[in-house]
Amino acid sequence: MQKTSMNPVTDPVAAATGRVAIRQLPIKTQPNSQSLTPFLQLPPKPPPNLLFSSPLASVELRHRARARRRRRPSHPRRAPAMRMGKYEMGRALGEGHFGKVKLARHADTGAAFAIKILDRQRILAMKIDEQIKREIATLKLLKHPNVVRLHEVSASKTKIYMVLEYVNGGELFDKIALKGKLSEKEGRKLFQQLMDAVSYCHEKGVYHRDLKPENVLVDAKGNIKVSDFGLSALPQNQRKDGLLHTTCGSPNYIAPEVLLNRGYDGSLSDIWSCGVILYVMLTGNLPFDDQNTVVLYQKILKGDARIPKWLSPGAQDILRKILDPNPITRLDITGIRAHEWFRQDYTPAMPFDDDDDNNISDGNLHMTENQDIETSPAISQINAFQLIGMSSCLDLSGFFEKEDVSERKIRFVSNYSPTSLFEKIESTVTEKGFQVQKNSGKLKVIQVCKEPANPRGHGNLLISAEVFEINESLYVVELKRSSGDCSLYRQLCASLSEDLGICKRQQLLKKDSMRQDLCRYNSSF
């Protein structure tokens, strides 16, 4: 018995228009078997160049496209986005044991942020609440272009929300894995940025202790951002010997002295981890690796990394000196910055001023526009009570030249106008070789040099100058150090105070408005 089956035969025009030409072909079936359902094969997909090879096909496809557009609603309904304060939550960026990270958009400004959402109950159950507190406390201290910024922290009964800078380039690990290894030029640039970030953290008394490519992010411009400070150590974590004693970090990147568990210098252990990262960037391999953890630790303690001969002599030398298992002879930040290989095409990154915040509080983000100091100085008015509040004591002599406990702010009183003050400060510091930037009613004084600033490697000096108005002829000048050498900062402030400040207390008390305010203040006690 024979049955017929439908076997399509296509031609280009028929296929393009969706019409199929079919012819009958005989097929054999087994005796006494049930009749088989004919099997219709789909025609093979026509080549792309046949889609519009005929006017008929073109008209047919355009007609179908118009029909689909007519059926599609012009304004599709979207599910309302979940909100956290003024942030609209978007897609998930990642997920871990204690929560997830979501992309968010600020409803007013449209700025993108990454919000880390942590589960409170899980944190308490895992007893890592101190680790989370440490990460928040650390990130609040750090404001550097190569460190992920923390903008805001809020909480509900069940969740903790950390609003972080959104870095859209992924991890450094992925960048290396994609390319296999980086060129020396690109690797040096990223290593310079990494050292700027690590040096800044150390100046603030913060030791990361878990530096690895997975904890270094890359933005869209190819610049790095150090993240994940959950295992970082602050000065209070040090014992009386000035050393850290907690063993932590990722096995392949951990320093030999950390493994010995005898106490270690957090800055030098971070330098070791940076050296491992540099090795991985330039070679695409780990300097110390083994599936057996005990063998891996033996290799790290021995410190015998095989440095490829095809690297440049400078790269080989700096790797060998950083991956020194003896922390005493290991290259420190000052030595790294002075190394010839490191200094090629090096421009130090300037940390943000302590006051250059996004002004985020209570879930609000306020964006301010920059103003030019020369054309419109933004001068804040203060009265006697606020002036007293700026000092750590009620002694008026402290107003004339007062340095706070942290040695980061020095203030003096002047009767020069704000415009004259800014002009004279700019003139003085420029003569001394500093650079000046004007931003938001402040004057930024920047020391730019490629040599290490001092033996401790504190980096370049960065000072912000701000003027507060007491009355129409009396002003307070505040000089605030964000980073750099303390002694150079004090010398510069002393010079400016001597040239521009009022040196006699009586001149301040001659002002009637100030005297009246102070009398009212004293009578209230």
From Swiss-Prot:
Essential cofactor(s): Mn(2+)
EC number: 2.7.11.1
Keywords in alphabetical order: ATP-binding, Kinase, Manganese, Nucleotide-binding, Serine/threonine-protein kinase, Transferase
Domain NAF span(s) in chain numbering: 372-401
Residues annotated as catalytic: 210 (proton acceptor)
Region (PPI): 407-436
Induction: By drought and salt stresses.
Residues binding ATP, per UniProt: 93-101, 116
One MF annotation (Gene Ontology) recorded for this entry: protein serine/threonine kinase activity
Record CDD domains: CIPK_C (cd12195)
InterPro entries hit by this protein: Kinase-like_dom_sf, NAF/FISL_domain, NAF_dom, Prot_kinase_dom, Protein_kinase_ATP_BS, Ser/Thr_kinase_AS
Pfam families: NAF, Pkinase
Ranges for domain Protein kinase: 87-342
Activation loop: annotated segments: 228-257
Catalytic activity from the UniProt record: L-seryl-[protein] + ATP = O-phospho-L-seryl-[protein] + ADP + H(+); L-threonyl-[protein] + ATP = O-phospho-L-threonyl-[protein] + ADP + H(+)
Biological process, per Gene Ontology: signal transduction
Top EC class, one word: transferase
Source organism, top-level taxon: Eukaryota
Entry-linked PANTHER family: CALCIUM/CALMODULIN-DEPENDENT PROTEIN KINASE KINASE-RELATED (PTHR43895), CBL-INTERACTING PROTEIN KINASE 21 (PTHR43895:SF65)
Role according to the record: CIPK serine-threonine protein kinases interact with CBL proteins. Binding of a CBL protein to the regulatory NAF domain of CIPK protein lead to the activation of the kinase in a calcium-dependent manner.
Domain remark from Swiss-Prot or TrEMBL: The activation loop within the kinase domain is the target of phosphorylation/activation by upstream protein kinases. The PPI motif mediates the interaction with the ABI (abscisic acid-insensitive) phosphatases.
Family: Belongs to the protein kinase superfamily. CAMK Ser/Thr protein kinase family. SNF1 subfamily.
Protein name from the UniProt record: CBL-interacting protein kinase 21
Taxon lineage: Eukaryota, Viridiplantae, Streptophyta, Embryophyta, Tracheophyta
